[in-house]
C-alpha cells in the first residue's frame, strides 16, 4: 500500500474534466486518498455536484480488509475486494487510480474495460510500465492508450515525499 502524495493527486486530477462526471470508481483505493482529494478539491466549487452527501455515486475496491474497514468507516461504498476480478455491468464516467506498480498494466487495462464510452481514467503508473512494453499486457496497454489518445505525463520523484517510498 503506497498512499498517493497530495502533489501527485493534484497533478492527476488537474487533467480531469468534471463537467460530465456522473460516477466515480477508485480501485485499489487504500484509505481513499484520491477520492478524498477529489472531493476536497471540488467541494469548494458551487456548481460541482460531488460533495459528502453524494457518496452513492462513488465506488471503491480494496483488497486489504483493514483498509476496507477504514473506507467503510469514512462512508465510502466498497463494492469488491480484488480489482482484477471485479466485474460489473456498471460503467464509470471517471476512474481514479494508483494501482500496485507490479501489476499496473493489468489494472489499467481492466479500468479501461470498466470506463464508459467518453469516460476518463486518471492513473498513477510506474514510468517503466509505459516506457518498457516487454510483456504482452504492456504491449496491449500501449496499443490501447494510443487507440484512446491517452495523455501521458511523466513525473520524476513523485513519491519521494510520500508516507511510504517507492
Roles of regions detected by a PLM:
Residues 1-166:
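Class I S-adenosyl-L-methionine-dependent methyltransferase catalytic core
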Amino acid at each position: 500500500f503506497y498512499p498517493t502524495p497530495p502533489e501527485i493527486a493534484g497533478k492527476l486530477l488537474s487533467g480531469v474534466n468534471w463537467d460530465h462526471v456522473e460516477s466515480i470508481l477508485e480501485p485499489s483505493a487504500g484509505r481513499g486518498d484520491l477520492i478524498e482529494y477529489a472531493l476536497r478539491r471540488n467541494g469548494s466549487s458551487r456548481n460541482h455536484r460531488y460533495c459528502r452527501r453524494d457518496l452513492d455515486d462513488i465506488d471503491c475496491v480494496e483488497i486489504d480488509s483493514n483498509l476496507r474497514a477504514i473506507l467503510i468507516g469514512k462512508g465510502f461504498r466498497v463494492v469488491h475486494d480484488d480489482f482484477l476480478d471485479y466485474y460489473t455491468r456498471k460503467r464509470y464516467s471517471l476512474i481514479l487510480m494508483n494501482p500496485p506498480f507490479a501489476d499496473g498494466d493489468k489494472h489499467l487495462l481492466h479500468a479501461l474495460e470498466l470506463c464508459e464510452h467518453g469516460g476518463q481514467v486518471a492513473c498513477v503508473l510506474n514510468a517503466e510500465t509505459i516506457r518498457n512494453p516487454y510483456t504482452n499486457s504492456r504491449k496491449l496497454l500501449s496499443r490501447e492508450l494510443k487507440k484512446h489518445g491517452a495523455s501521458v505525463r511523466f513525473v520524476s520523484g513523485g513519491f519521494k515525499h510520500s508516507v511510504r517510498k517507492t
